[in-house]
Each structure stands twice: as structure tokens, then as C-alpha cells.
């Protein structure tokens, strides 16, 4: 593996669907070039992400077992894609064994993949609750329910959604294209939101016994002194694991070209975020909207001074 090349770590917890097959779906080829390691256990698939905003050289790194993750691989992980067998009631148990590593990597893109949810194994509600708790996005390769044909803003599904999410990530070696860079110039600060959340949670857990029912999506208590206080102040009460990715994509669409495809995707993303916010209680919805507004303003190059003091408690 070339030094300094970021990677999307891909693994499978299914005996019938390998990580290599998933990578081949992502690359759109059954004849992908494989760079074998000396042990021939971990495999690297070089991939050039080249879109209208940027280009980046990354590796799709297939790791069959968590015990094969070396320090070099761990340092390069910027996305994590894991496949599981939804037909087994214990299908998520093997995935959960990867969580300590995933939490240490703090990857901005984490995707849980299956062929489709299964009522006799892991159903949709179980899969989505697990994803919300641990900060993953659920993607079904062959969902039973496809977007309606007359839907003006159909959501991407399957492999297309995985590719879309990987394209929306801000890779460490990204090379921006011409004037596209403005909207991405501050996305690295947005991409650090998950790291700030993790830091705040870590500080809080050291001061208080963790509750067995606590979830990552619960409100983070604020602290008014010490390192934990500064970390807690950097995040809002509502922590949505997918919010950073949504804002990254929204910012890239806003600062992109004015073509029809870009315009349609922009409205589709706005609709997705609106629908997501609509499920929150009123007070949480206000805080959610405030966080999105602030982060999005910074993402497109807005002046921080112009939004200082902006709060849902302000009187207008």
C-alpha cells in the first residue's frame, strides 16, 4: 500500500458475500486490479475518484478480519463499509465486534450494507436503530421497496448510494478543480464534527458512570470548565451521525455548476434533510435547524462573524 494514500476499509461479516465482491460492485467491474500484500489476506483496490468538484486517489481496502488491521491501515482509514447477513438474527453481532475499531478511526463515512432487510432475520427497524445508535448509514443493495417512479426527488439506493457517499467525503489528499474549491474549503472543519462529538463523549464518560441505555444520538450535557467544557460547547444538543455527510453534500451541490442534474440533486437533498428534521420534537427540530444553518454557512465560505450569536433562543 502506498504511504499516505487514504482508504475506505471494506469488510464482510457474511459467509456468502465477500468484501471483494462488494468492492467489485463499487468499481463496476469483475476484473478489478488487486494489489496483494505479502500475507495475501488484506487486499488493496486502487480507485481514482474523479468528479466535477475534485479528484482523489484512494484504496478500497478489503480486510477479512479485524485482527488483520495493521497500524498503517488504521491510520489511513477515512471510510468504513461493512456487509452483513440480514437473514440471520445474529447478523449484527459480528458487525458489532468491529465497533471498537470503528470508533477509534472516527471515519466520516460509515455504511452498513446488506442485500435487503429481512423480517425473519434483521428487519428494517432493527437495522436502522443499530445504525442510528452507532453512526452508520444503512444501504440495501437490492431493496424490496424502490423509490416511486413519479417521485420528483428519488433517493439513491444500492451500490449507487455507496459510491455517492464515498464521492461526498472530503479525502485527505483531495485535489480541487478550479473554482470548485470555495465550497469545500471549510468542509474539513465540518468533517471534524464527529471527532468533536467523540471527544465530548469521552470526556463526559470519564466524569460520569455510563448509562447502559445511553445512545450516541442522545443530548450531550454541557460542561462549563476544563477540556470537556470546551469540547461540549462545540457541539449542539442534538447529534445526528449522518448530519455531517448531509451538509458536505449540500455544500458541494450549492457551490457546483448550475446544470440540471446538480439542481435536481440539490432539491432532493434539501427534501431529505427536511423530512429527517420533521421527525424530531419541536425543540430538537429548532436546534437541528440551527446547527445545519451554521455549519452550512461555514461550508460555503460564509464569514463566521456574521453568524456569531445566532441561537434558537434569540429574540427576533
Curated annotation (Swiss-Prot):
<dbReference type="GO" id="GO:0005829">
    <property type="term" value="C:cytosol"/>
</dbReference>
<comment type="function">
    <text>May be involved in endocytic recycling of growth factor receptors such as EGFR.</text>
</comment>
<comment type="subunit">
    <text>Associated with AP-1 and AP-2 complexes.</text>
</comment>
<feature type="region of interest" description="Disordered">
    <location>
        <begin position="198"/>
        <end position="232"/>
    </location>
</feature>
<keyword id="KW-0813">Transport</keyword>
<keyword id="KW-0597">Phosphoprotein</keyword>
<protein>
    <recommendedName>
        <fullName>Alpha- and gamma-adaptin-binding protein p34</fullName>
    </recommendedName>
</protein>
<keyword id="KW-0653">Protein transport</keyword>
<dbReference type="GO" id="GO:0015031">
    <property type="term" value="P:protein transport"/>
</dbReference>
<feature type="compositionally biased region" description="Low complexity">
    <location>
        <begin position="222"/>
        <end position="232"/>
    </location>
</feature>
<dbReference type="InterPro" id="IPR019341">
    <property type="entry name" value="Alpha/Gamma-adaptin-bd_p34"/>
</dbReference>
<dbReference type="GO" id="GO:0016607">
    <property type="term" value="C:nuclear speck"/>
</dbReference>
<keyword id="KW-0963">Cytoplasm</keyword>
<dbReference type="Pfam" id="PF10199">
    <property type="entry name" value="Adaptin_binding"/>
</dbReference>
<feature type="modified residue" description="Phosphoserine">
    <location>
        <position position="311"/>
    </location>
</feature>
<feature type="modified residue" description="Phosphoserine">
    <location>
        <position position="312"/>
    </location>
</feature>
Amino acid at each position: 500500500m502506498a504511504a499516505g494514500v487514504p482508504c475506505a476499509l471494506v469488510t464482510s461479516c457474511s459467509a456468502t458475500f465477500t468484501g471483494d465482491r462488494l468492492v467489485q460492485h463499487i468499481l463496476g467491474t469483475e476484473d478489478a486490479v488487486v494489489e496483494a500484500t505479502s500475507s495475501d489476506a488484506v487486499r488493496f483496490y486502487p480507485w481514482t475518484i474523479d468528479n466535477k468538484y475534485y479528484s482523489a486517489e484512494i484504496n478500497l481496502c478489503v480486510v477479512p478480519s479485524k485482527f488483520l488491521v495493521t497500524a498503517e491501515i488504521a491510520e489511513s482509514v477515512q471510510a468504513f463499509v461493512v456487509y452483513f447477513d440480514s437473514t440471520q438474527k445474529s447478523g449484527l453481532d459480528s458487525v458489532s465486534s468491529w465497533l471498537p475499531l470503528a470508533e477509534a478511526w472516527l471515519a466520516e463515512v460509515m455504511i452498513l450494507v446488506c442485500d435487503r432487510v429481512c423480517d425473519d432475520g434483521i428487519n428494517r427497524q432493527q437495522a436502522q436503530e443499530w445504525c442510528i445508535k452507532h453512526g452508520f448509514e444503512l444501504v440495501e443493495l437490492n431493496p424490496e421497496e424502490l423509490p416511486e417512479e413519479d417521485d420528483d426527488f428519488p433517493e439513491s439506493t444500492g451500490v449507487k448510494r455507496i459510491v455517492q457517499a464515498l464521492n461526498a467525503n472530503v479525502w485527505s489528499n483531495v485535489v480541487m478543480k478550479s473554482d470548485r474549491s470555495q465550497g469545500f474549503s471549510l468542509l474539513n472543519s465540518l468533517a471534524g464534527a464527529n471527532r468533536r462529538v467523540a471527544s465530548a463523549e469521552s470526556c463526559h464518560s470519564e466524569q460520569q458512570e455510563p448509562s447502559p441505555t445511553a445512545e450516541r444520538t442522545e443530548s450531550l450535557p454541557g460542561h462549563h470548565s476544563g477540556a470537556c467544557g470546551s469540547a461540549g460547547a462545540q457541539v449542539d444538543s442534538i447529534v445526528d451521525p449522518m448530519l455531517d455527510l448531509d451538509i458536505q453534500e449540500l455544500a458541494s451541490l450549492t457551490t457546483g455548476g448550475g446544470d440540471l442534474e446538480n439542481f435536481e440533486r440539490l432539491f432532493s437533498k434539501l427534501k431529505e434533510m427536511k423530512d429527517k428534521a420533521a421527525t424530531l420534537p419541536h425543540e430538537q427540530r429548532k436546534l437541528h435547524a440551527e446547527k445545519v444553518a451554521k455549519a452550512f454557512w461555514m461550508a460555503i465560505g460564509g464569514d463566521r462573524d456574521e453568524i456569531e450569536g445566532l441561537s434558537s433562543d434569540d429574540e427576533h
